[in-house]
Amino acid sequence: MQESVMQRMWDSAHLSGGNAAYVEELYELYLHDPNAVPEEWRTYFQKLPVSGGAAADVSHSTIRDHFVLLAKNQRRAQPASAGSVSSEHEKKQVEVLRLIQAYRMRGHQVAQLDPLGLQQRPAPADLAINNYALTDADLDTVFRTGDLAMGKDQATLREIHQALQETYCRTIGAEFTHIVDSDQRNWFLQRLESVRGRPSFSPEIKSHLLERLTAAEGLEKYLGTKYPGTKRFGLEGGESLIPLLDEIIQRSGSYGTKEIVIGMAHRGRLNVLVNTFGKNPRDLFDEFEGKKVEGLSSGDVKYHQGFSSNVMTPGGEIHLAMAFNPSHLEIVSPVVEGSVRARQDRRCDAVGDKVLPVTIHGDAAVAGQGVVMETFQMSQTRAYRTGGTIRIVINNQVGFTTNKQEDARSTEYATDVAKMIQAPIFHVNADDPEAVLFVTQLAVDYRMQFKRDIVIDLICYRRRGHNEADEPSGTQPLMYQKIAKQRTTRELYADSLTQSNVLDNERVQAKVDEYRAALDNGLHVVKSLVKEPNKELFVDWRPYLGHTWTARYDTRFELKALQELSSKMLAVPEGFVVQRQVSKILEDRQKMGAGALAINWGYAETLAYATLLFEGHPVRISGQDVGRGTFSHRHAALHNQKDGSTYIPLQHLYEGQPRFDLYDSFLSEEAVLAFEYGYATTMPNALVVWEAQFGDFANGAQVVIDQFITSGEHKWGRLCGLTMLLPHGYEGQGPEHSSARLERYLQLCAEHNIQVCVPTTPAQVYHMLRRQAIRPLRKPLVALTPKSLLRHKLATSTLEDLTQGSFLTVIPEVDQIDPSKVERVVMCSGKVYYDLLDKRRNEGREYIAIVRLEQLYPFPEDDLAEVLAPYQNIKNIVWCQEEPMNQGAWYCSQHHMRRVAVAHKKELFLQYAGREASAAPAVGYASMHAEQQEKLLQDAFTV
């Protein structure tokens, strides 16, 4: 509907003639310094229409100055006689433009970035005037400034050179010319050059800066005095991080951001928790004194703890979340990205305006850890993008004891890895708080406008050792001689403010005293902290607390509704041409839905997702080749053979259904699994699935499995319902395509921390997946899924199995065998069951019963005992596995099996049938594989 005339008048009332002078004055100010006008006016001016090909707008005062300059140079502008003078001038003009570009590209190499002054880098020849056929005689010659945003079209070479040095060679080193997109490059040119890299801040802002620095320094001094020698991984030397984070929060709040998730390592973490998040200092002191936190099992050290709070900003209340993390550096970054994506999905924030990720790195780790590259690589992909991350490097120029650049990295800067995604990088001297503030404003504005990553390289130093008990001068003698004489950032900035009459010494000291008094009294020290936060910003986890793995659940689904869902799931849009083989799969699934064909694995799995969506559970699946499935069994994404378009039927079941996200991941295990862990810990109602291409490759993410998935609840109380599907099975494909390393997961099992399942029928995987979402328990599920069973003639189920059944932790003997005649029970898991069944039937050994353990942890002792109960005459009980003896379930689960066997019949001794112990999971020769397989099957019946 067209807006009314009155509405248009109201909307443009601020532009009426009476306000023209004010608006023009604001615009004049904007042209000189875009940072100097309020955010809403800056946004308005940025959206003003520009004629095609027109140059950037110029302020009126600049035009007036230009005419004065023309008058002064009128005589010079007239050539004496020949065109050679003009030609020579034009050649020099080209050189001037080259000089401008050189400063933009390489000015950062001579910027004053190191607070200690230890960096001695030779100035690039590109920045010397005489490198461009220019001499000192040209310094007062007037040249066109090109696109140099210095406020005028022409200036002397001296003025141009001075502007370039002030913009690019002071305490900010800007790297953005590697960005391909010209709009982004021009945006930085305008923002930097218009203020020569140093905007003027109001006295109020400067006072607030000092207050934040006082807080950062004050906490470290207080802890150092009260708990001397105790590890805290202090921020001393990098105190500018606190005003930096404060500006990110307040400025992003003015954009309408509702949540910020921060991931960081140990350095400065306690300072951030108290001075940014508003953690009560008294609680921190309790942790220093070793008091146990109620409700946690093992707990973790204080500098790994997460936290959340709400603070007030100009745009309203913001929820802050600090991610829990281990000491494994950089691995928390993709976890943060996953948590942010879940929050964005929950808010239907597809653009990334409402939730902002911030990750804080160390210089040594950001340059050295491979997961950093993986996390950057995922930043613009459909599956993992979050609208851009502000990445901060606390660059204290030393990694524990390593500070020689030739040892620490092969790149010029620790941040060079970010250039792979064309992220702008701003190196800034941490002893210049106003430069830090300006760079932070640029970072927030850039991220909000372009929705891409940006890096702030906060170059500082580490006043003490790696931790407070470490003496660093033994390995960095010269650096620590310099640090011993270095005044703190707060002291330097306080002197600057008193000398410029912004504050007097009494007010400076008052800030110090006020902060110390707050700590002494155990008071919150974040003034913007919201004492009664808006609970709508939280997720209610209460329904998922206090449950055991035996909690009741119902995964049945009414037949008629199931068939209706099946029809919708198999519907293809008119004119959508699928591949011939895929068409046959869909036809077969139609028959399965009608009960005319036995149900296979792919159909049962996708039906599980459809029913969960119907019941209100979002579903997210990612991993390599998950749309089709590595083994062509899933086909949840259909591809049009005519135009290449993709159709995902599970996204079109009914109007207003929950999200169904299906993403083929880029080729990463570590970052992707960490991302999905972060997502699952933030979206408890969803079924979040990561599938490995082969289970063998999951160990590329072993850090995520060890430090988060299996231990996160025990250490931090973090619930997680992530499901891992790991294709596993010995089919003669060699040592790298046979084993998901089941033994690794079982070895990590304790205190009911995870679930390990090995489903062998379509109905089992259907109920297993539904159980994971429907049951209120939120524990990670590790499922070893099959490969050859996907199309095995015996590995099928019926519609009744899906509509009436449930997940069976133990499946009893399926053939009609007289229990009283059974002398041997063979227990097994996975694909080997069908090999055993086939052999038993062929050989007619009806005195042998075969029992499947479908859940290996938590071990279902009661269910197994119930299945064994009818067999009162057994003489032998055997565990059979395809894996070598030192792998698989044997070592980690035999004590559970033995306990049940002995309870059933005291004289029973559990025997082993399987491959001999091996350093590799499997052999590489088909003939040897077949020989081993036949032997273990024979052993199962005779050992």
List where the protein language model places each region:
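Flexible, glycine-rich loop/tail regions that form catalytic "lids" or insertion modules at the edges
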Residues: V94-Q101, H108-F143, T230, R452-I454, ...
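Conserved phosphate-handling catalytic cores of large alpha/beta enzymes
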Residues: T401-S410, K419-V455, I459-G465
